Amino acid sequence: MKLIKGGVTAPQGFSAAGLHAGVKAGSSPEKYDLAMILSDRAASAAAVYTRNRVKAAPIYVTMDHLGSGTARGVIVNSGNANACAPDGHEHAEAMCIAAAK
């Protein structure tokens, strides 16, 4: 793997940030648990998905949102991997709506 100077923000028009958002209840405030990569405009986007029969709700939301082949942002969370959580679809959509603001 080759590291690119500037990382994910090396290409012009991209920015990124990470923070502690408390995605997982009780997590340490020092632990970053949410990151976002943002493009100034719609950019070509693609994803590789699991072949498992059981997929977390965010996978289905991502599949739907990437149907056009473009995106302006990517949200990454850490510390919350329960694929069978109740209301997962609603929570994933709410995260997308919050990020869009």
Regions found by a protein language model. Give the residues of each.
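N-terminal amphipathic/basic leader segments beginning at the initiator methionine
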Residues: 1-50
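Short glycine/serine/threonine-biased micro-segments
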Residues: 16, 71, 77
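Histidine (H) residue identity feature
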Residues: 20, 65, 89-91
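Generic structural signal for well-ordered, non-membrane alpha-helical segments
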Residues: 29, 52, 59, 88-92, ...
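Broad gene-expression machinery/nucleic-acid interaction feature
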Residues: 31-33, 56, 73
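Active-site-flanking structural segment that lines cofactor/substrate pockets
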Residues: 37-70
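Alpha-helical support elements that line or immediately flank enzyme active sites
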Residues: 75-101
